[in-house]
């Protein structure tokens, strides 16, 4: 058994774990292991995790962040897609009886069912993750469009993506992820994390972002799933205008084009405008108009 005198988030211990298990990181999974304890303290503090909280973690890796979460939280439910890491996590987290690791792809998991199976639904629920850069947007979009309510979400991601979360309409950074976040959450960048504190070092710097649930909206779409569908379609081809992207979603039959134009008229939106110019409220109005035009 490896010595557990050092935290996992230590360059020497991280390399020792990798050496012991002959672990080579998979670039295809965006694996970079965090080795800075100050960053981990900051993540836990930013999430304001207490002993009454349940925490969902995405991508525990070799357990560096998981260890810190387990020390602070009531229970941690971690989703790890790479089955090579399961025996490593069994070893590195052996001292913690409040951690459950499941070998599942978070994008395919029934999150609500897993929470009901493994966690006490009466406790506050938070999500914390060091997200792989290549799949940050799909994971966040999936979480934000899902039916699980988190008190807050604290994620480490590529700084460029973090900048998008609080972007304004009409800017290059504004996109589907911006709208998905701003529909439900307030975004706050807590810390910029240099690439040098990872093994191996990624090619870009990271940032810790806290997303906090907003009060219930007074202006809501007729159906949230339809709303997110329209948002994704609007940004499917950024260089195309809204008219062309809506045709890609609904089709180019004459009657469909007529219905799309009807919806745009109802919403008083210029068909030549690009999605990046629309606010969250305008996307809600558009979604309802598409419903009125029998397209949704």
UniProtKB/Swiss-Prot annotation:
SMART domains: rADc. The keyword Metal-binding does not apply. Keywords: Cytoplasm, Methyltransferase, RNA-binding, rRNA processing, S-adenosyl-L-methionine, Transferase. It catalyses: adenosine(1518)/adenosine(1519) in 16S rRNA + 4 S-adenosyl-L-methionine = N(6)-dimethyladenosine(1518)/N(6)-dimethyladenosine(1519) in 16S rRNA + 4 S-adenosyl-L-homocysteine + 4 H(+). The keyword Cytoplasm applies. Its main location: cytoplasm. GO terms for molecular function: 16S rRNA (adenine(1518)-N(6)/adenine(1519)-N(6))-dimethyltransferase activity; RNA binding. S-adenosyl-L-methionine binds at residues 32, 34, 59, 80, 105, 130. It is found in: Cytoplasm. It comes from the Bacteria. Specifically dimethylates two adjacent adenosines (A1518 and A1519) in the loop of a conserved hairpin near the 3'-end of 16S rRNA in the 30S particle. May play a critical role in biogenesis of 30S subunits. Belongs to the class I-like SAM-binding methyltransferase superfamily. rRNA adenine N(6)-methyltransferase family. RsmA subfamily. This is Ribosomal RNA small subunit methyltransferase A. It comes from Lactiplantibacillus plantarum (strain ATCC BAA-793 / NCIMB 8826 / WCFS1).
